[in-house]
Amino acid sequence: MIFKEEGSMKLVKRIGLILLSIIALLVVFLVGSVVVDRLLDRGRIDALVNTWIENPNGPAVGAFVAQPSGDGPHPAVIMIHEFWGMKPSVNGKAAALAEEGYVVVAPDTYRSQVTSWIPRAIYLAMTTETAQVNTDLDAVFNWLATQPNVDPNRIMVMGFCYGGGKSLEYSLYNERVAATGIFYGSLITDPAQLQALPGPVLGIFGATDQSIPVAEVQSFEQALNSAGVTNQITIYPGQGHAFVESIEGIRAGGAQGEAWQEFLTFLSEKL
């Protein structure tokens, strides 16, 4: 009996060592993957931005700028990326919006970091400080306001996923923002905070989005109403998170096309 107990303990220790070794290998793999992914960032960003905007309180802000035809002055939209960082899909939507008569700036709020790897995307979204984002967006907003073809009183901020939440935060920070667009972004449901919003709000959400439940969206709408903020909140049936993926998907119709058309209508009426 004593020998059996000793054998069992040895087996437990052996299993423990194997598990620790596996965990150690996973940690090494994750760290190595992040390092390799980070080394590729600069080339990715250079391929996605076409303008560097001076920032008096930090490094220059890389951005994709899309211009409409005509002299203007045009309304303008600051379009903030998802938690991946800058992506061709965001540039495609920015270019399509410019065709509708808007000057569009899609800034890189991660300061030259971008990824297609979910763990790193989550890390970037969680560790990029709101104060830093607001500083960079200030540089973009002020640059837009001085452009000869932009109406400085008609500058909107909007975004997708991470960018939707940052749009809401920035609108609470900058009283000059004319309107706010949130495509399935993080929400604030305190009416006292939302009273500071300087303009109308559009919210686009999916009914099956597990990260932003319908109940939270409804609480957000109620809080906006209590705060006296003009708003248009729509929950699309059968749609999950990040369902407005690309301009190709938008042009194909369905929920993506409907949500985009709702956005365009909101712009034409409110901006």
Segments predicted by a language model, with ranges:
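C-terminal catalytic histidine-bearing segment of alpha/beta-hydrolase fold enzymes
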Residues: A227-L271
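N-terminal Sec-pathway targeting helices
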Residues: K4-L25
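Short alpha-helix in the alpha/beta-hydrolase fold that links the catalytic acid
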Residues: K93, P213-A223
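Short beta-strand/loop motif that positions the catalytic acidic residue
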Residues: L197, G203-F205
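Serine-hydrolase catalytic machinery in alpha/beta-hydrolase-like enzymes
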Residues: R14, G43-I45, N50-N149, E245-I247
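Acidic catalytic loop of the alpha/beta-hydrolase fold
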Residues: T208-I212
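Alpha/beta-hydrolase
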Residues: I80, P107, F183, Y236-Q239
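Primarily recognizes the serine-hydrolase "nucleophile elbow" in alpha/beta-hydrolase
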Residues: A139-A196
